[in-house]
Design a protein with these regions (language model features):
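Glycine/Thr-rich phosphate-binding loops of Rossmann-like dinucleotide-binding domains
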Residues: 17-18, 45, 108-109, 154
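Glycosyltransferases and closely related glycan-assembly transferases
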Residues: 85-100, 106-122, 135-143
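Short amphipathic alpha-helix
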Residues: 17-28
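Active-site-proximal region of nucleotide-activated glycan assembly enzymes
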Residues: 44, 55, 115-169
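Residue-level detector of alpha-helix initiation sites
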Residues: 14-15, 19, 104-106, 128-132
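Conserved nucleotide-sugar phosphate-binding/catalytic loop shared by glycosyltransferases and other
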Residues: 4-12, 31-81, 85, 161-169
């Protein structure tokens, strides 16, 4: 077997993000890899991830309201604080070898931490309309995968040229 990897996954907000991430996490665990999640304890991932037997590194973030652009300032401040919290958690627990983002704003601090620290990350877009977080993080992704072929166009010119259609995991 290949080297066992330490994998950290960010997926949050809705079951549409979390359930595909949990399915992949279970497969990775079955193959001998160590898997943890980043998420919010007060959101759905705060219940589903521990119930599935995976550790959850807690962070607190929120999206912003595009009709009220000033909310982006508060959102950015929360992302920066969350990125710092992740840095401290990884200093204590060991940094991941690779990370995965399954969409939602909860992935942004993790994937920004990865970019800054040279840790490769992958994206998966399972929705019919790619979300803002995945679009923002695509430029530095090692690879992006999509559930639907039409979603590939959202990643054109961003990051790795060989994005793939995988369907939902």
């Amino acid at each position: 077997m290949a080297k066992s990897l330490k994998v950290t996954i960010a997926a949050g907000g809705t079951a549409g993000h979390i359930n595909p991430a949990l399915a992949l996490a279970e497969e990775l665990r079955d193959r001998g890899h160590s898997v943890s999640f980043v998420g919010q304890t007060a959101k759905l991932e705060g219940r589903l991830v521990p119930e599935a037997g995976f550790p959850l590194i807690p962070i607190h973030v929120q999206g912003f309201d595009r009709s009220r652009p000033w909310t982006a300032v508060q959102s950015l401040a929360m992302v920066l604080r969350a990125k710092g919290a992740l840095g401290r958690a990884f200093a204590e627990q060991g940094a991941p070898d690779v990370c995965l983002g399954f969409g939602a704003y909860v992935e942004v601090p993790l994937l920004e931490w990865c970019r800054k620290n040279g840790v490769p990350y992958l994206l998966h877009e399972q929705n019919s309309v790619p979300g803002l977080a995945n679009k923002m993080c695509a430029a530095h992704a090692a690879r992006a995968s999509c559930a639907l072929p039409q979603d590939l166009s959202a990643f054109d010119g961003k990051g790795a040229a060989d994005h793939v259609v995988t369907g939902n995991t």
